[in-house]
């Protein structure tokens, strides 16, 4: 994993998504002008029970809660606004997280972000799933349990439990409770898989 940091490690946060809004004012916050020099960036806060692949890139004000995972070649770049990844959420291979001034990235609990997806200045609520190659743009909130289909471009808020697809994404139908539970189970599977990778890393040095 590549980390670009310049300051001493700050105190570890509580790692609970419900408490994160209170942490934002204590961080660098969201910039209103140009990106400062790296010396101004806080160091990432990665819970000991989170897993970050060696080839993932974590820069600046990024916080991963327990059980969160960042997979190979994923990028979390917190040089403009904070990036918060909640407990048990996974950011899969090649996905990109980044914010804009006053538009941080906030990811809830048991969220799945598929391969090569982009989440830019958006909020993903608990249990939602962002499909492979989908793009979620600034200011959007994807509601709890929602599903963004692969390749979609999301430009407006997604209701909780909705399936959206297309470019721009449109609501197609409401997901069943079983389908929403399945998405959270998928995230839990990735949490277990991340633990296996972490164990293999420890065993192999």
PLM regions: where:
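N-terminal segments that cap or nucleate solenoid repeat domains
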Residues: 26-70
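Glycine-rich hexapeptide-repeat left-handed beta-helix
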Residues: 3-45, 79, 83-87, 93-100, ...
């Amino acid at each position: 994993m590549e980390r670009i940091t310049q300051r001493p490690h700050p105190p570890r946060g509580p790692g609970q998504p419900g408490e994160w809004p209170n942490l934002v004012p204590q961080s660098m916050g969201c910039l209103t002008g140009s990106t400062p020099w790296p010396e101004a960036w806080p160091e990432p806060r990665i819970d000991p029970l989170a897993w970050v692949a060696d080839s993932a890139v974590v820069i600046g004000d990024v916080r991963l809660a327990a059980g969160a995972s960042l997979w190979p070649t994923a990028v979390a770049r917190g040089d403009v606004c904070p990036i918060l990844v909640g407990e048990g959420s996974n950011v899969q291979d090649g996905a990109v997280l980044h914010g804009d001034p006053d538009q941080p990235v906030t990811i809830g609990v048991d969220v799945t972000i598929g391969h090569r997806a982009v989440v830019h200045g958006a909020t993903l609520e608990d249990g939602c799933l962002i499909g492979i190659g989908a793009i979620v743009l600034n200011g959007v909130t994807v509601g709890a349990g929602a599903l963004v289909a692969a390749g979609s471009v999301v430009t407006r808020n997604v209701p909780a439990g909705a399936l959206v697809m297309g470019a721009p994404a449109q609501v197609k139908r409401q997901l069943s409770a079983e389908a929403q539970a399945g998405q959270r189970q998928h995230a839990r599977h990735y949490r277990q898989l991340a633990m296996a990778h972490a164990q293999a890393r420890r065993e192999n040095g």
